Curated annotation (Swiss-Prot):
Residues 1-35 form a transit peptide. It catalyses: N(6)-[(R)-lipoyl]-L-lysyl-[glycine-cleavage complex H protein] + glycine + H(+) = N(6)-[(R)-S(8)-aminomethyldihydrolipoyl]-L-lysyl-[glycine-cleavage complex H protein] + CO2. Changing T146K: In NKH; loss of glycine catabolic process; loss of expression. This is Glycine dehydrogenase (decarboxylating), mitochondrial. Its cofactor is pyridoxal 5'-phosphate.
C-alpha cells in the first residue's frame, strides 16, 4: 500500500506517526488524519497529500450516515415544510442562545464500524480470563447458544419497550410470567415480580417493604450476607430513616417489637447451610418480617425458604444462563407471600382477559408504581432487567426441573469431592454442610496456596480473617478439580477422591435440608427441551411483539433509537462476558480503559467533571445523585436541608427517588406554556430557603420545550444554598448543542439506554451513570469489595448497586456509539432528532393541538398531542387512539403523561422521513375517523377506535357484525398491507378485571396456543 501511495505522489503514515489510532488500538492504522489536528511542525506538502488522499479514498462507511435516518434530501424537504433555510436556523429558534455551546466538541474523529470492532478486540484482550471461584453471588455458567443467538442477539427481543401496550406485547409478557412462575416455584412463595436490578438492590427494596408494612425503624441483618448486599442495604437505610444492625441470629433481639424485618443469606456468603426456622418464628412472633437472600440453583436441591415461613425471598438469577459480565446486567428476583403483593416493588405480570374473554397477559397493579403514585409508590423502579429475566426463564424452560436439579447436583457433588480432597490434604473446612462454597482454613501458608493458584490462573476469595473461599459452578470439570486439589497440595486426583468416597448419599441430599417438594411442574417447563422446540417457542413469542424491527416506537421521553449491530456485537465476547466483578484490577485492564475513555467522553458531552457508572438505571441514578447531594450537604453541616423542589410535570421517578433519598418533596407549578412557573418557583424557594436541598428538573422539559430561563432557575437555587439535579432523560436533545454542566446543573444521570444506544430490552437492562461537578465528586458512591475512591479525602455516599461499575458488560455499546459518531455526528444526531419532531408537529398541527411550544414556536425533540377535546366531541380518549394505532402497525406514543389525556411523541434521529410520514398519515387518518364520529357518519359506540385493536383472529372470523368493513379495521391506509402488517395478537385488554382477579403465575395450559408436550410424546 505504501508503494501505491508513492505512485500517487503521496506519503501514507503508519501508526501514531502518520495515521490515527484509537487509544488502546494495535497494529497499523490507515485512517486519515483529522483535518483539525496539528501536524506538529510537519511540512505543508504532507498536509496537502493527506487532504488529496481523503478525496481519492473517501470514506464509504460513515456510521453517522447509517445511524441518522433522514438523508440530505429528506432534511431539505422537512426544513422546507417548516419554512426554514437550514438546520442551524431551526436550532437557533429552538435552543436558547445563552446556553448553546459556542465551540465544537473536543472528541476524536469518528471511527468506522470495522475499525471500532478491531479496537474493541484490542481493548478486550487486556482483560485476563482466569477461572474465578470467588462466588459472592456471581458464578460462571454455561449460556445455551440457542438462547444467546435467538434471544440476546436478536433485535426482535432486545429493541422492544416495557410492555405497557399488552396487545402488542404478549410474547415477552408470557416470558416474564414464566420467569415469575419459575421464581415462585423454586422459592416456595406465592407471588414474584418481573425482576429487579440486582441482588443488593432487591435486599434494599425488602428493607423498604418491611418498613412500609409495619412502620418500624430497625432492620436486622445477618453479617454473613454478601458484603455488597449489606452495603447497599445500609446506604438505603441511612436515607430511609431506618437503623440497620448487624447481628448473628443468636444475637437478634425482637423483644422490643421495634424490628421491621430481618435479612439473612441461605446458603450464606461463607457457604454454610443452616436452619433458620427458629429465627423466622421469633421474627413472626414479634410482628417482624423475615427476608431471605438465596440462590435459585441451590434451591433446586435445597429446602425452599417458603417452606420454613419466609415472607420475602430475593437474589440473583444470573447463574441461570446469564454471563458474569464484570458485574452485570443480571436480573434479580423478588418473591413474597400473597398478603404482601400490593406492597411489592417493580413490575409484575398478571393474567387477565381481553374483550373477547380470552385469557391474556398484562402488567398488573400499576397503580402502586412510580409513574402513577410518584413519591407514594412502592419503589422508584422504572427500568428493571426484563431481557435478562427472559434469558433466565428460557434457561429454566430449556432444562426443566430435572435438568436444573441435575446441574445443581453436579455442582454440589463437585464441591463434595473438593471438600474431601482438601481435608485429606490437611486443610480445615469451616462448615460441614454447604451447597457450592467452601471456607477453608489452610493447613499451610495462604501465600503459598495463592501463588500456586496464580500459576494456574485461578482466583479465590480471600476473607479478612485469612481464610480462603472457593465457590464452584456448572462449568467445573474434572480438570478444574484436579487443578484445585494440586493448588492445595492434595496428592490424589479428583477421580481417586471420588472413588474413595463411593456413591453413598452425602451432603444436602442426605440431610434434613433436602428438597422434597416438586417445582416447575407447569407444562411450559416440560415441553421445550429440544433445541428445535425451544427455538420455535422463542420465535413464536417474538412474533407477538412489536419492536424496532417492525416500525418506529414514538414513545415520548423514551428515545427509542437505533441499537446498531456493531455496538451490540462485543457484549457477547468472552473477554467482556466472562470476567467476575471482584477480580483484581490488573485482570480487568480492558474494562478499566473503557471506563476511563467513556467517562472522559461523557464529561465532554455534559460539562461535568466526573462520572460514576454504578447506577443500573435512570431511576437508580436519580437516587444516587440525590444521595450524593445529601452527603455533600451533611459534610458542610447542612444536614437540615432536605426539601426538594420538583415541577409537577416531572417524571414519576423524580419524586419517588427524592423520597428514597430522605427528601421532602415540594411541587412546583407549571405555567400554561409548559414551563416552570417562575413566580411560584420564587415563592417556594423563599418559603423553604433555610431547608432547601435541591431542585429536580428535566431539560428540555417533560413538556417538550427548551425553557428560556433555565440558567436563571439554576442561579436562583444556588443563591439559596441548594443544588440542581438535572434529569438526563432528555439528553438526546442536548448532546453537542448545550451542556447541563455549563448552564448551572450540579449533577445528572445519563440514560445510556436512551441517548447512548443501549437497547431497552423490553424493560431493561439500562444504565444510569451520574455525572457531577467537582464539588460533588468526593461524595460519589463507593464499593466495599473494590474501592472506587480516587483520593483519601473522599467521603462516599455509600453503595447503590451490587457491582462496583454496575452493568459493565453493556457499557461497550455506548462507548462504541460515541466513538463511531464522533463529535460532529453526535451533534448531527441531536439536530436531526429536533428536526424530526418539529416536522411531525408541523404535519399534525392542523389536525391535533400541539400542547406546548418554545418561545419562538418550536418544540424540542418531542411534543404533546392534545386528545382531550375528543372526549367531549366523540367520546374518544387517548387510549382509543393508542389502541387504534396498533392497527396501523405502530406502538402508541407515551399515553396520558405528563398531561392526562394526551399523547407524547418522540421520533428520535434514527427514523427517516418516510417512516415519519407513515406515522403522521396514520394519526391524520385516525383524526378523520374521530371526525366521522363527531359528524354522525359512524356509530359512537361501535367504531374502529372503540373496537380497536383488530386481531387476525377477529378479522378472519366467520362472524362480522360491525358497521365498518374488515378492510377499514385491518388495512386502513395503503401502506398497511397483508404482506407486511404487524398484527395485534389479542383484542383490547380488560385492565380492571386483571387487578380484581390477580393471577401472577402461569395459567393452565388450555390458554396457550398449540401446546406441545415432550412428556405426552414420551408416554405415547
Amino acid at each position: 500500500m505504501q508503494s501505491c501511495a508513492r505512485a500517487w505522489g503521496l506519503r501514507l503514515g503508519r501508526g501514531v506517526g502518520g495515521g490515527r489510532r484509537l487509544a488502546g488500538g494495535s497494529g497499523p492504522c490507515w485512517a486519515p488524519r483529522s483535518r483539525d489536528s496539528s501536524s506538529g511542525g510537519g511540512d505543508s506538502a504532507a498536509a496537502g497529500a493527506s487532504r488529496l488522499l481523503e478525496r481519492l479514498l473517501p470514506r464509504h462507511d460513515d456510521f453517522a450516515r447509517r445511524h441518522i435516518g433522514p438523508g440530505d434530501k429528506d432534511q431539505r424537504e422537512m426544513l422546507q415544510t417548516l419554512g426554514l433555510a437550514s438546520i442551524d436556523e431551526l436550532i437557533e429558534k429552538t435552543v436558547p442562545a445563552n446556553i448553546r455551546l459556542k465551540r465544537p466538541l473536543k472528541m476524536e474523529d469518528p471511527v468506522c464500524e470495522n475499525e471500532i470492532l478491531a479496537t474493541l478486540h484490542a481493548i478486550s484482550s487486556k482483560n485476563q480470563i482466569w477461572r474465578s471461584y470467588i462466588g459472592m453471588g456471581y458464578y460462571n455458567c454455561s449460556v445455551p447458544q440457542t438462547i444467546l443467538r435467538n434471544l440476546l442477539e436478536n433485535s426482535g427481543w432486545i429493541t422492544q419497550y416495557t410492555p405497557y401496550q399488552p396487545e402488542v406485547s404478549q410474547g415477552r409478557l408470557e416470558s416474564l410470567l414464566n420467569y415469575q412462575t419459575m421464581v415462585c416455584d423454586i422459592t416456595g412463595l406465592d407471588m414474584a415480580n418481573a425482576s429487579l436490578l440486582d441482588e443488593g438492590t432487591a435486599a434494599a427494596e425488602a428493607l423498604q417493604l418491611c418498613y412500609r408494612h409495619n412502620k418500624r425503624r430497625k432492620f436486622l441483618v445477618d453479617p454473613r450476607c454478601h458484603p455488597q448486599t449489606i452495603a447497599v442495604v445500609q446506604t438505603r437505610a441511612k436515607y430511609t430513616g431506618v437503623l440497620t444492625e448487624l447481628k448473628l441470629p443468636c444475637e437478634m433481639d425482637f423483644s422490643g417489637k421495634d424490628v421491621s424485618g430481618v435479612l439473612f443469606q441461605y446458603p450464606d456468603t461463607e457457604g454454610k447451610v443452616e436452619d433458620f426456622t427458629e429465627l423466622v418464628e421469633r421474627a413472626h412472633q414479634s410482628g417482624s418480617l423475615a427476608c431471605c437472600a438465596t440462590d435459585l440453583l441451590a434451591l433446586c436441591i435445597l429446602r425452599p425458604p417458603g417452606e420454613f415461613g419466609v415472607d420475602i425471598a430475593l437474589g440473583s438469577s444470573q447463574r441461570f444462563g446469564v454471563p458474569l459480565g464484570y458485574g452485570g446486567p443480571h436480573a434479580a428476583f423478588f418473591a413474597v407471600r400473597e398478603s404482601l403483593v400490593r406492597m411489592m416493588p417493580g413490575r409484575m405480570v398478571g393474567v387477565t382477559r381481553d374483550a373477547t374473554g380470552k385469557e391474556v397477559y398484562r402488567l398488573a397493579l400499576q397503580t402502586r408504581e412510580q409513574h402513577i403514585r410518584r413519591d407514594k409508590a412502592t419503589s422508584n423502579i422504572c427500568t428493571a432487567q426484563a431481557l435478562l429475566a427472559n434469558m433466565a426463564a428460557m434457561f429454566a424452560i430449556y432444562h426443566g426441573s430435572h435438568g436444573l436439579e441435575h446441574i445443581a447436583r453436579r455442582v454440589h457433588n463437585a464441591t463434595l469431592i473438593l471438600s474431601e480432597g482438601l481435608k485429606r490434604a490437611g486443610h480445615q473446612l469451616q462448615h460441614d454442610l454447604f451447597f457450592d462454597t467452601l471456607k477453608i482454613q489452610c493447613g499451610c501458608s495462604v501465600k503459598e496456596v495463592l501463588g500456586r493458584a496464580a500459576q494456574r490462573q485461578i482466583n479465590f476469595r480471600l476473607f479478612e480473617d485469612g481464610t480462603l473461599g472457593i465457590s464452584l459452578d456448572e462449568t467445573v470439570n474434572e480438570k478444574d478439580l484436579d487443578d484445585l486439589l494440586w493448588i492445595f497440595g492434595c496428592e490424589s486426583s479428583a477421580e481417586l477422591v471420588a472413588e474413595s468416597m463411593g456413591e453413598e448419599c452425602r451432603g444436602i441430599p442426605g440431610s434434613v435440608f433436602k428438597r422434597t417438594s416438586p417445582f416447575l411442574t407447569h407444562q411450559v417447563f416440560n415441553s421445550y427441551h429440544s433445541e428445535t422446540n425451544i427455538v420455535r417457542y422463542m420465535k413464536k413469542l417474538e412474533n407477538k411483539d412489536i419492536s424496532l424491527v417492525h416500525s418506529m416506537i414514538p414513545l415520548g421521553s423514551c428515545t427509542m433509537k437505533l441499537n446498531s449491530s456493531s455496538e451490540l456485537a462485543p457484549i457477547t465476547w468472552k473477554e467482556f462476558a466472562n470476567i467476575h466483578p471482584f477480580v483484581p484490577l490488573d485482570q480487568a485492564q480492558g474494562y478499566q480503559q473503557l471506563f476511563r475513555e467513556l467517562e472522559k467522553d461523557l464529561c465532554e458531552l455534559t460539562g461535568y467533571d466526573q462520572v460514576c457508572f454504578q447506577p443500573n438505571s435512570g431511576a437508580q441514578g436519580e437516587y444516587a445523585g440525590l444521595a450524593t447531594i445529601r452527603a455533600y450537604l451533611n459534610q458542610k453541616g447542612e444536614g437540615h436541608r432536605t426539601v426538594c423542589l420538583i415541577p409537577k410535570s416531572a417524571h414519576g421517578t423524580n419524586p419517588a427517588s427524592a423520597h428514597m433519598a430522605g427528601m421532602k418533596i415540594q411541587p412546583v407549578e407549571v405555567d400554561k406554556y409548559g414551563n416552570i412557573d417562575a413566580v411560584h418557583l420564587k415563592a417556594m424557594v423563599d418559603k423553604h430557603k433555610e431547608n432547601l436541598a435541591a431542585i429536580m428538573i428535566t431539560y428540555p422539559s417533560t413538556n417538550g420545550v427548551f425553557e428560556e430561563n433555565i440558567s436563571d432557575v439554576c442561579d436562583l437555587i444556588h443563591q439559596h444554598g441548594g443544588q440542581v439535579y438535572l434529569d438526563g432523560a432528555n439528553m438526546n436533545a442536548q448532546v453537542g448543542i448545550c451542556r447541563p454542566g455549563d448552564f448551572g446543573s450540579d449533577v445528572s444521570h445519563l440514560n445510556l439506554h436512551k441517548t447512548f444506544c443501549i437497547p431497552h430490552g423490553g424493560g431493561g437492562p439500562g444504565m444510569g451513570p451520574i455525572g457531577v461537578k467537582k464539588h460533588l465528586a468526593p461524595f460519589l458512591p463507593n464499593h466495599p469489595v473494590i474501592s472506587l475512591k480516587r483520593n483519601e479525602d473522599a467521603c462516599p455516599v455509600g453503595t447503590v448497586s451490587a457491582a462496583p461499575w454496575g452493568s459493565s458488560s453493556i457499557l461497550p455499546i455506548s462507548w462504541a456509539y460515541i466513538k463511531m459518531m464522533g463529535g460532529k455526528g453526535l451533534k448531527q444526531a441531536t439536530e436531526t432528532a429536533i428536526l424530526n419532531a418539529n416536522y411531525m408537529a408541523k404535519r399534525l398541527e392542523t389536525h391535533y393541538r400541539i400542547l406546548f411550544r418554545g418561545a419562538r414556536g418550536y418544540v424540542g425533540h418531542e411534543f404533546i398531542l392534545d386528545t382531550r377535546p375528543f372526549k367531549k366531541s366523540a367520546n374518544i380518549e387517548a387510549v382509543d387512539v393508542a389502541k387504534r394505532l396498533q392497527d396501523y402497525g405502530f406502538h402508541a406514543p407515551t399515553m396520558s403523561w405528563p398531561v392526562a389525556g394526551t399523547l407524547m411523541v418522540e421520533p428520535t434521529e434514527s427514523e427517516d422521513k418516510a417512516e415519519l410520514d407513515r406515522f403522521c398519515d396514520a394519526m391524520i387518518s385516525i383524526r378523520q375517523e374521530i371526525a366521522d364520529i363527531e359528524e354522525g357518519r359512524i356509530d359512537p359506540r361501535v367504531n374502529p377506535l372503540k373496537m380497536s385493536p383488530h386481531s387476525l383472529t377477529c378479522v378472519t372470523s366467520s362472524h362480522w357484525d360491525r358497521p365498518y368493513s374488515r378492510e377499514v379495521a385491518a388495512f386502513p391506509l395503503p401502506f398497511v398491507k397483508p404482506e407486511n402488517k404487524f398484527w395485534p395478537t389479542i383484542a383490547r385488554i380488560d385492565d380492571i378485571y386483571g387487578d380484581q382477579h390477580l393471577v401472577c403465575t402461569c395459567p393452565p395450559m388450555e390458554v396457550y396456543e398449540s401446546p406441545f408436550s415432550e412428556q405426552k410424546r414420551a408416554s405415547s
